[in-house]
């Protein structure tokens, strides 16, 4: 069964408040989303495997630990998920980056795929899917299904804010995928937006309407 982890660190909550504020401009919004993604990465990677190695410090030889598990691929759901990639890459610079393009049909609210480019060894990697908002859950569930179709086995989803409805959709569709969020918000409104949410993350990241 999938696990939902809410990462309620004071720095994350402070920055999330600034992200939510409608008066925060695109430049600050981009920087804040990147910073929160980087902070969340500490918890997202908490269960990564380690191995012991021998090194030599300026003082003596000693044993220490390094990452030993699978290599990582970050897969943003376009376009808003792009805003979280650089923050995670700062901590895992060797990670590969795939892209999945989905947009939401404004009438049906269902996701439509328009782009998919993934590392060839996607099945051997730990996959971190990024999307600032988990609203209806349709895009995330479809993106994860597409990853599995391409061979991915080890997937975790990272979002800034999530609606309970979206969490349930992803958990029901993919009980093997853990979800990490900075905030679980109240609900979805009639238009499928998260309340209180942060508006349209893609538009706010890139200054579009």
Curated annotation (Swiss-Prot):
EC class: transferase
GO molecular function terms attached to this record: GTP binding; magnesium ion binding; uracil phosphoribosyltransferase activity
Gene3D superfamilies according to UniProt: 3.40.50.2020
The EC number on file is: 2.4.2.9
Residues binding 5-phospho-alpha-D-ribose 1-diphosphate are 79, 104, 131-139, 200
Catalysed reaction equations from the record? UMP + diphosphate = 5-phospho-alpha-D-ribose 1-diphosphate + uracil
Single Gene Ontology BP term?
UMP salvage
Annotated residues that bind uracil are located at 194, 199-201
Instruction: Name its pathway.
Output: Pyrimidine metabolism; UMP biosynthesis via salvage pathway; UMP from uracil: step 1/1
| Keywords assigned | Allosteric enzyme, Glycosyltransferase, GTP-binding, Magnesium, Nucleotide-binding, Transferase
Q: Which residues form a coiled coil?
A: none
Q: What does the UniProt cofactor note say?
A: Binds 1 Mg(2+) ion per subunit. The magnesium is bound as Mg-PRPP.
Q: What protein does this entry describe? A: Uracil phosphoribosyltransferase
What are the names of the required cofactors?
Mg(2+)
Q: What regulates the activity here?
A: Allosterically activated by GTP.
The organism named in the record is: Clostridium tetani (strain Massachusetts / E88)
Q: What does this protein do?
A: Catalyzes the conversion of uracil and 5-phospho-alpha-D-ribose 1-diphosphate (PRPP) to UMP and diphosphate.
UniProt similarity note: Belongs to the UPRTase family.
